Curated annotation (Swiss-Prot):
The keyword Magnesium does not apply. Keywords: Cytoplasm, Ribosome biogenesis. Pfam families: DUF150_C, RimP_N. Coiled coil: none annotated. This is Ribosome maturation factor RimP. Required for maturation of 30S ribosomal subunits. One of its GO terms (biological process) is translation.
Length: 166
Protein backbone atom coordinates (compact mmCIF):
# COMPACT_ATOMS: atom_id res chain seq x y z
CA UNK A 1 0.00 0.00 0.00
CA UNK A 2 1.28 3.45 -0.91
CA UNK A 3 1.83 6.20 1.63
CA UNK A 4 -0.27 9.35 1.36
CA UNK A 5 2.85 11.18 0.11
CA UNK A 6 3.24 8.64 -2.72
CA UNK A 7 -0.44 8.93 -3.61
CA UNK A 8 -0.18 12.73 -3.76
CA UNK A 9 2.99 12.44 -5.86
CA UNK A 10 1.15 10.18 -8.31
CA UNK A 11 -1.62 12.71 -8.89
CA UNK A 12 0.36 16.00 -9.00
CA UNK A 13 3.81 15.20 -10.41
CA UNK A 14 2.89 15.20 -14.11
CA UNK A 15 1.02 18.51 -13.84
CA UNK A 16 3.98 20.12 -12.09
CA UNK A 17 6.38 18.74 -14.72
CA UNK A 18 4.14 20.12 -17.48
CA UNK A 19 4.38 23.52 -15.76
CA UNK A 20 8.20 23.33 -15.74
CA UNK A 21 8.59 22.34 -12.09
CA UNK A 22 10.20 19.39 -10.34
CA UNK A 23 8.35 17.96 -7.35
CA UNK A 24 11.11 17.76 -4.74
CA UNK A 25 9.39 16.74 -1.52
CA UNK A 26 6.00 16.34 0.13
CA UNK A 27 5.76 16.36 3.90
CA UNK A 28 3.10 16.75 6.52
CA UNK A 29 3.90 19.07 9.40
CA UNK A 30 2.31 21.02 12.19
CA UNK A 31 -0.05 19.91 14.93
CA UNK A 32 -1.78 16.68 13.87
CA UNK A 33 -0.06 16.99 10.48
CA UNK A 34 -2.63 19.50 9.22
CA UNK A 35 -0.15 21.31 6.96
CA UNK A 36 0.88 19.75 3.65
CA UNK A 37 4.20 21.26 2.58
CA UNK A 38 5.26 20.73 -1.02
CA UNK A 39 8.72 21.78 -2.17
CA UNK A 40 9.31 22.50 -5.85
CA UNK A 41 12.26 23.45 -8.05
CA UNK A 42 12.42 24.58 -11.66
CA UNK A 43 13.37 22.05 -14.30
CA UNK A 44 15.40 24.63 -16.24
CA UNK A 45 17.56 25.84 -13.36
CA UNK A 46 15.78 29.19 -12.99
CA UNK A 47 14.99 30.55 -9.55
CA UNK A 48 11.53 29.78 -8.19
CA UNK A 49 9.50 32.96 -7.64
CA UNK A 50 6.55 33.65 -5.37
CA UNK A 51 4.40 33.74 -8.53
CA UNK A 52 5.67 30.24 -9.43
CA UNK A 53 4.70 28.94 -5.99
CA UNK A 54 1.27 30.57 -6.26
CA UNK A 55 0.67 29.06 -9.70
CA UNK A 56 1.80 25.60 -8.54
CA UNK A 57 -0.30 25.91 -5.37
CA UNK A 58 -3.47 26.68 -7.36
CA UNK A 59 -2.91 23.67 -9.61
CA UNK A 60 -2.07 21.31 -6.73
CA UNK A 61 -5.02 22.53 -4.68
CA UNK A 62 -7.45 21.88 -7.54
CA UNK A 63 -6.06 18.38 -8.09
CA UNK A 64 -6.15 17.48 -4.39
CA UNK A 65 -9.74 18.76 -4.10
CA UNK A 66 -10.83 16.49 -6.96
CA UNK A 67 -8.82 13.44 -5.84
CA UNK A 68 -9.89 13.85 -2.18
CA UNK A 69 -6.85 11.96 -0.84
CA UNK A 70 -6.60 13.86 2.44
CA UNK A 71 -9.47 13.09 4.80
CA UNK A 72 -9.33 16.02 7.22
CA UNK A 73 -9.09 19.75 6.63
CA UNK A 74 -5.53 20.88 5.87
CA UNK A 75 -3.46 23.86 4.80
CA UNK A 76 -1.37 23.65 1.65
CA UNK A 77 2.04 25.32 1.51
CA UNK A 78 4.03 25.32 -1.72
CA UNK A 79 7.58 26.65 -1.52
CA UNK A 80 10.89 26.66 -3.31
CA UNK A 81 13.16 23.80 -2.32
CA UNK A 82 15.75 26.47 -1.53
CA UNK A 83 19.50 26.80 -1.90
CA UNK A 84 20.16 23.88 0.43
CA UNK A 85 17.52 21.71 -1.20
CA UNK A 86 17.11 18.06 -0.31
CA UNK A 87 18.30 15.44 -2.78
CA UNK A 88 15.53 12.86 -2.70
CA UNK A 89 15.95 11.04 -6.01
CA UNK A 90 19.04 9.31 -7.37
CA UNK A 91 18.87 11.50 -10.50
CA UNK A 92 19.35 14.59 -8.30
CA UNK A 93 22.97 13.59 -7.70
CA UNK A 94 23.75 13.75 -11.43
CA UNK A 95 21.93 17.06 -11.78
CA UNK A 96 24.12 18.56 -9.05
CA UNK A 97 27.52 17.08 -9.98
CA UNK A 98 30.34 19.15 -8.53
CA UNK A 99 28.17 20.63 -5.79
CA UNK A 100 28.84 20.26 -2.07
CA UNK A 101 26.39 18.00 -0.24
CA UNK A 102 25.74 16.84 3.33
CA UNK A 103 24.69 13.21 3.56
CA UNK A 104 23.26 11.35 6.53
CA UNK A 105 23.34 7.55 6.35
CA UNK A 106 20.99 4.92 7.78
CA UNK A 107 23.94 2.96 9.15
CA UNK A 108 27.68 3.26 9.65
CA UNK A 109 30.01 3.41 6.66
CA UNK A 110 33.71 3.47 7.55
CA UNK A 111 32.70 4.27 11.13
CA UNK A 112 30.59 7.34 10.22
CA UNK A 113 26.96 8.14 9.47
CA UNK A 114 27.54 11.69 8.19
CA UNK A 115 29.59 12.86 5.24
CA UNK A 116 30.10 16.19 3.54
CA UNK A 117 31.79 16.52 0.19
CA UNK A 118 31.49 17.31 -3.51
CA UNK A 119 29.50 14.99 -5.74
CA UNK A 120 32.01 13.47 -8.16
CA UNK A 121 29.71 11.03 -9.90
CA UNK A 122 26.52 9.04 -9.49
CA UNK A 123 26.02 5.78 -11.35
CA UNK A 124 24.86 2.21 -10.79
CA UNK A 125 22.99 3.25 -7.63
CA UNK A 126 26.26 4.55 -6.11
CA UNK A 127 27.17 8.11 -5.17
CA UNK A 128 30.83 9.15 -5.21
CA UNK A 129 31.82 12.03 -2.94
CA UNK A 130 35.14 13.85 -2.61
CA UNK A 131 35.42 14.40 1.15
CA UNK A 132 38.55 16.40 2.01
CA UNK A 133 41.44 14.27 0.70
CA UNK A 134 39.54 11.04 0.11
CA UNK A 135 36.86 9.66 -2.16
CA UNK A 136 33.88 7.98 -0.51
CA UNK A 137 31.63 5.53 -2.33
CA UNK A 138 28.11 5.43 -0.88
CA UNK A 139 25.39 2.99 -1.88
CA UNK A 140 22.32 5.13 -2.61
CA UNK A 141 20.12 2.80 -0.54
CA UNK A 142 22.21 3.67 2.56
CA UNK A 143 21.34 7.37 2.32
CA UNK A 144 18.79 8.52 4.89
CA UNK A 145 18.79 12.13 3.68
CA UNK A 146 21.00 14.55 1.81
CA UNK A 147 21.01 18.29 1.19
CA UNK A 148 23.00 20.66 -0.96
CA UNK A 149 25.33 22.95 0.97
CA UNK A 150 25.43 26.68 0.32
CA UNK A 151 29.13 27.31 -0.27
CA UNK A 152 31.01 30.54 -0.90
CA UNK A 153 31.44 29.43 -4.53
CA UNK A 154 27.68 29.01 -5.03
CA UNK A 155 26.98 32.29 -3.24
CA UNK A 156 29.43 34.16 -5.50
CA UNK A 157 27.70 32.73 -8.59
CA UNK A 158 24.33 33.80 -7.26
CA UNK A 159 25.51 37.28 -6.34
CA UNK A 160 27.26 37.59 -9.69
CA UNK A 161 23.95 36.93 -11.45
CA UNK A 162 22.11 39.62 -9.48
CA UNK A 163 21.75 42.86 -11.40
CA UNK A 164 21.94 45.98 -9.28
CA UNK A 165 20.13 49.04 -10.62
CA UNK A 166 20.96 52.61 -9.63
Amino acid sequence: MQTIEQQITNVIEKSLTDMGFELVLIKFKGVNHKVVEILIDSLNGEKISVADCTKASSTISAILDVEDLIEDAYSLEVASSGLERPLVKFENYNRFLGREVKVKLKELLNGKTRYQGKIIKAENNKVYLKCEAQEVLIDYDLIKNANLVLTEEVLKKLLGSVKVSN
